[in-house]
Amino acid sequence: MNKIICGDALTVLRTLPAKCCRCCVTSPPYFNLRDYGVSGQIGLEPTMQEYIARLVEVFAEVKRALTDDGTLWVNIADSYAGSGKGAAFYPENAKKYKQGSNRGGLGVSAITKAHPKLTGKNLLGIPWRLAFALQDSGWILRQDIIWSKSNCMPESVRDRCTKSHEYIFLFAKRQRYYFNSEAILEPAVGFNNEPIAGSIGAFGQEQSRRRKGNSKTFRGGKYTAQNTFDNSRELSRDSHGNCENNTGKRRMRSVWNMATTASGGVTHYAKFPNELAERCILCGTAEGDIVLDPFVGSGTTCRVANRYGRQYIGIDLNPEYCKAAEAEIPINLF
C-alpha cells in the first residue's frame, strides 16, 4: 500500500475498498482559519453547518473504509465569531499555518463572521458540534482527549485566558474495537518500588514478612493470614502483602501534554507532533495494519505509521503538501 494520493478527500475515499484500513488519524482543515488557495477545499464554507456537513460526509466514507474494529482519531481546534481579521489567506501566509491557536507570527486564533446568530467574541464550539454530528451519523463517540500545548503562542486578547489546547476525539465503528492500551502506558506519577512500610507487629505471625502490596479486594473468611499475604490477584501498593507491583506504569490519561512542532518550506508551520500520532497509531493498530489520513497535510500520520511498521494511505488536495509529505517519508527497506 504506502501511498499519498493528491485529490479531493471524498472523491479519493470512495475509490478505496471497504474495510481496508484499521485506523484513521487526521486533522481536517479548521473552519474559516485558512485559505490554502486550492479549489474545492474544506474550511471556507459560508456557515459552520455546511462545514460540518461536508466533514460528516467525508467521515462516512472513512467509516466504510475502516475494518469493523477500526477507530477514528480527529484532532480539531475551535474558532470565534467576529470580524475575520485574524484569518490566514493564500498565498501571503496560509502555506505555513494549520493549527488554530498556533499560527506563528499572527499570534491569535482567527475569527469569522460565518454564523449569523452569534455576536462577536462567541466561541463557536466547532469541535463539539462536529463530534455530536458524527455521533448522530452513527459513530460511537468514545472519548474526548485534550492536547495541552506546552509551547502555545501568546495572544493579545485581554478578556479571556490564552488558548493552549485542542481536542482529539476518539470514535469507534463498533462497540468492540481494537485498542491496545498496553502500547501507550505512561510512567506512574510518584511511583516508588520500595516495599510499602508498616508498623512491625501489626500482623501477628506475619509480622516479620515484608509488606509489598497485594490484592485490592478480598471476599471474606476464605483467606487465612498466610493466604492474604500470598494472594496473587490484582495488586495495590496502597495495601499490604507479599506480591510486589513493580511496573511503574499506568494507563494513559486523557490530557496529553506535548509541544507543537514547526517546519518551514511548504509544509504546515504547526503540524501536530509525532508523539500525538504515535499514541493514536500504536494503540489503534497492530504491525502491518493500514493507517488512513484523508487530510494528510505535512504527512505526520504517514511518517509515523511507516516508522512503526504500519502501512499508510494519505490524501490531500494540495499538490505541494503531497510532494512535501512524500519527501519526508523515508524509504522503508524492511
Place the predicted regions along the sequence by residue.
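Class I S-adenosyl-L-methionine
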Residues: 5, 11-26, 30, 34-42, ...
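Extreme N-terminal starter segment of soluble prokaryotic enzymes
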Residues: 1-3
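N-terminal phosphate-binding loop and adjacent alpha-helix
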Residues: 43-52
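A short glycine-rich, Lys/Arg-flanked "PGG" loop and its adjoining helix->strand segment in the class I
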Residues: 51-68
